[in-house]
Structure formats: C-alpha cells, structure tokens
Amino acid sequence: MYMNDYKRWNEFPLEDSDLTAELAKIAGDEAEIKDRFAVSLKFGTAGLRGVLGAGSNRMNIYVVRQATQGLANWVKTQGGNQLVAISYDSRIKSDVFAKEAACVLAANGIKVRIYDALMPVPALSFATRYYKANAGIMVTASHNPAKYNGYKAYGPDGCQMTDDAAAVVYAEIQSTDILEGAKRISFEEGIAQGLIEYVGDDCKEGLYDAIKACQVRPGLCKTASLKLVYSPLNGSGLVPVTRILNDIGIDDITIVPEQKYPDGNFPTCPYPNPEIFEALRLGLELAKQSGADLMLATDPDADRVGIAMKCPDGSYELVSGNEVGVLLLDYICAGRIEKGTMPANPVAVKSLVSTPLADAVAAHYGVEMRSVLTGFKWIGDQIAGLEAKGEVERFILGFEESYGYLAGPYVRDKDAVVASMLICEMAAYYRSIGSSVKQRMEEIYAQYGRYLNKVDSFEFPGLSGMDKMAGIMAFLRSNPPHAIGGYDVVKVTDYQKTEETGLPSANVLVYGLEGGATVIVRPSGTEPKIKAYYTTLGKDIAEAEEQKNELSDALTPLFS
C-alpha cells in the first residue's frame, strides 16, 4: 500500500520542488518509503507534529491542506462567526503553512484573521478569543529540533482543542484525499474577496494591555534599574517580550546577538528548548560578561521561558520550571495580599507532575491549589470552569514543571510573555528590598523543606517506538513494583482508572513511596518519549539528590 502511495506522489505534479527532489532521492529505499508513507501524522488535541518532508507521515503543504480541510468541515457545523485565527513562529516553512491554511479556509467560505508577522502562542490564543473565532491555528513545533514543524489547533475559547472536537476533525481529515481533496484559492484571491484579513492593531494592543494588567506592583520596574540578558532563541519572542518589558520600565536589555532574529535552522542550539543548558549557554556567557541580574530565554513559539538567576558570589544558577512556578506563586500571593488585590477564594492550578512544594506554598497563603492532568489545556479547562460560574477573577496562576506559566484569564495557553514580565518584576522587587531571587528561593526551601524535582526522558524513535512505549506501560501495569530503589511503594495511582482520580483518563502511573517521595511515569504527548518524574524531599539538597539517584538507577533499566 505504501509503495502505491509513494508512486502516486511521485507521479503527481507537486507544487513544492523540495518534495519532488526528496521523492527522487529515496527511490529504491523501501525502509525510508515505508517510514514516510505507511502511516499518516495523527491529528489529536495538540494538532499535528512531525519532521518536514515528503509523505503522509511528514509535515508539508499537502498534509497542512488536508488537515485544514478537515478543520474547515468541522467549523462549518459550528455556526457562529465562521472565522479562524492563524499565527506562526520562526520555523522552516511556518509562514508558508500558515498561508496555505488560510487559503483552504477561505476556499471553504470561512473568514481568516492571520498575523502579518510571526507571533507567539499567547497571541494566537488571544486573537481566537478577541475575534470570537470558531478555531485557531498555530503553526509551530514548539521546542523540537529544526527538522520538525507542526500545526496546533485551538477551540473557540483559545484553549487547545478538546478530545471530542479533535476526534471529529481527525475523521474529516481521514476522509479527505491528501493530494487533491482540499479546496483552495490563492492567498491574494482570499484577500481580494475579504475572506482573509490581517489581525488588527486593536487586537495586538489588547493583548499587551491584558498582560500588563497582570502586574503585581505596577510602576516598580521603572525605578529598579534591573539589568537583563534575553534570548528569543531565534524564535517569535523578540518583539512581544521586549515590547512588554519596555512598557513596564525595563530598558537595560541585552539581546543575545546570535539568537536575536528569527531563524528556523536554530544554528546555535540544535534543540531550542529553554529547559536544556545548551540552549541557554550563550545567554549565560553574556550575562556573566555584563553582570546582568537575570537571564531569560523563550522557546520558538514563546509559550515557555527558562531563566538563570545571579547568585551573591556573582555566579549564575539555572532555575527549574518547578522553582519558577513556586517563586511566581509565592510572589503573586504575597504581593497581591500586600496590595489588597487578592481575590476572595483564590485558585491556582498546576499539572500533577509539578512539585508538591507549590501545594505547601498555596496552603500557606490560603490559596486553593488544583492539580490536573499534564497538558496546559487542562489548566485552561479549569479557567473555563471558573468563567462559566462568573468567578474567573479567582484564578491567579497556572503552571507546569515544563516551564509553562499563565497569570491571567485573557488566554488559555501558557504565555512566556506574561511570565517574562512577572519574573522581571519579581527580580526587581527583591533587588529593591536588598534581597534576590536566589535568596527568596532559599528562604522558601528553609520554610517548607528541600524538595527536589527531576525528570528523566527516554526516547523511542521510529515506527516501532510507539509499540515499545505501549509495551513498557503495559508491563508496569501488569507488574506493579513493590519497591523502587529500596523504598517501599505505599500507593499506586493509575490515571487510566478514572473512578480513582476523578479526572479524565490519562496514561499516567504515580508511585507514592515511603518517606514521601513520588515517581511518576508517562509517555510524552508530543514526542516519542517516556518521561519519569522524581520528587524527593531531604534535610538538604545532597540527601534529596542521593534519593533521586537511587530511584532512577532502579527504574532506568526498565526503559532500555
């Protein structure tokens, strides 16, 4: 079957010469042909993501057209404004794919609002809500290597598409011929017919106003003289992040020159992920040279941010996603209580794999902490639930350990722009009282205990990878460990058993160990990986590290 598909693509007058050249190059290579054509990229709640190239199992204009026709078929059943918002990041062909999506939607009589330049995830979520769109499309593969691109789909609330809607769209995609099934008009024709319009300045400024409304101490940064190094990692964060920081009074910003401008090849770091040291290396070097108070880096679609803080001895320390989440929660709570802006019955939300230290901080400030499944859409779902009750002002912060944060209800996905603003405001505040981010983190550990959170990832590439991952999860379910690394397992929670958790079904296993440590195992939702999350608690960092190493040494052989 896949050889027939390859032959058809080879004989079809493809509009992208790169694809034609690739097909010629793989002639006779059955393994490569099978990898590209035996399956298709599957559309889920996170949309599509795959390697760029020719074939149904790759990201290209034909896969994008097919996906958009499926989305269009769904939109046409939804009533409303019959409108879709579109944005894109700096990745290879992101702008091409965004325009292709617009052309298919317009050919289906669906109006499009598309950004005239690359803009990040929060801008797409905001535009979807601002224009009361039926859906949104963000062309990005987030922090994946340069050879990847993707297509995130959003519902009318600006949150990633629900399971039910994604299933309908996927069925429509499957019934659409990949090469000839999508309707299409030219981008210019769509503009001329008034079906395609650019996002207006009113929407763009509305986003900035909404972000600035999340300040805890407005005006503080204008007198704090904060010195900052920032890297957009060749992505979409440069304009929105520097704009918002300038607006709140931070002008001393040094941009990492090699990573300043959009470049989908990501020449300085093969994996543009702010969780990874290599992505932050140039920024750290520049921070040390300039004596900056803080270094920030946002990923290509600017929905996640990583930071390094200056220590009293002049060195710099990377801050984990869990630590930033806890620091922001502590800062927002203390600041809003001080300023009298804390809502009644405040709510914060975190993913279940994020640190329990956040629960302790929330309890201290009288904040209800809700833990949800991994994936920011579940945090967005909690905001939507509050909004439906007329209580959206109760939401003060949502975060994931994977460096995603949101501090207001104006969008329904993680936002590195508001996170960058609040991180800088927090650093400026501690500087103004003779303290520092580092000192406050140590005070939090002293008050609540030395929690350590680490994640190990195990890759399973290729067509067989998904089967291997499924086999490992099945083995763990049928052979639950009684002990891990010498620590007795006192509780096992299987999130596929919804009657136990009260949450939607998820492929997640949680092991509670004697002494309070936890191990969580789950497959990644976006990459061919299984992740193991370790939380340990010790009298000091050395003890917590030792326990983590004992646990990971015992568990790692299962993933080999």
Predicted regions: what they are:
Residues 4-101, 190-191, 195-225, 236:
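An N-terminal, well-structured beta->alpha segment
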Residues 32-37, 41, 149-279, 286-287:
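Gly/Ser/Thr-enriched, mixed-charge loops and adjacent short helices
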Residues 37-57, 141-144, 228, 232-244, ...:
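Conserved phosphate/anionic-ligand binding catalytic regions in large, soluble enzymes, centered on
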Residues 85-148, 251-306:
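N-terminal small/polar loop signature for handling phosphorylated ligands or for N-terminal nucleophile
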Residues 96-105, 148-155, 303-323, 358:
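Short Gly/Thr/Asp-enriched flexible loops that form oxyanion-binding sites at enzyme active sites
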Residues 154-184, 322-345, 350-361, 416:
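Glycine-rich phosphate-binding loop plus the immediately following alpha-helix
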Residues 288, 292-294, 315-317, 335-522, ...:
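Phosphate-binding and adjacent anionic-ligand microenvironments
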